[in-house]
């Protein structure tokens, strides 16, 4: 008997199908940070909030005026779970107090990365998110089987060099897909 290991989607994008009914994920592009037999974790990367880094720093460093640069660093809604918790995706390089290196990318969760970005000595490219998307064991696999998502290999250019409102379409184009031509009716071959 052949031993087949499961296929996991760590370091991939999930593209929400046009018929996605869940308002937390409709029209989203989600980067998958971790996916294994226990479940999955991801960050929505195309939903900026009405917050910027200056707003966050006012809470973290109330005695220090944030630089004007901080007003132009958006904060994204990373997902509906733990929306008070911050996550920073950035290229590999400096390691902060709480940094996990992924495949050519790092995820930092400590305040020092925010301070470094604010002070102009942090990663040149980053995405700051509050909250994350989480799936229990088997949940994401079931959603994929129900055609709720398309999967796309990660592309740093989409994450760091494409404006947030164009990321979903850019990921779909990476697959050769035009989302406006997709139907909610799908079959299984």
UniProtKB/Swiss-Prot annotation:
It comes from the Bacteria. This is UPF0301 protein PFL_5830. It comes from Pseudomonas fluorescens (strain ATCC BAA-477 / NRRL B-23932 / Pf-5). Pfam families: DUF179 (PF02622). NCBIfam families: PRK00228.1-1. The lineage of its organism: Bacteria, Pseudomonadati, Pseudomonadota, Gammaproteobacteria, Pseudomonadales. SUPFAM superfamilies: VC0467-like. Belongs to the UPF0301 (AlgH) family. GO terms for cellular component: cytosol.
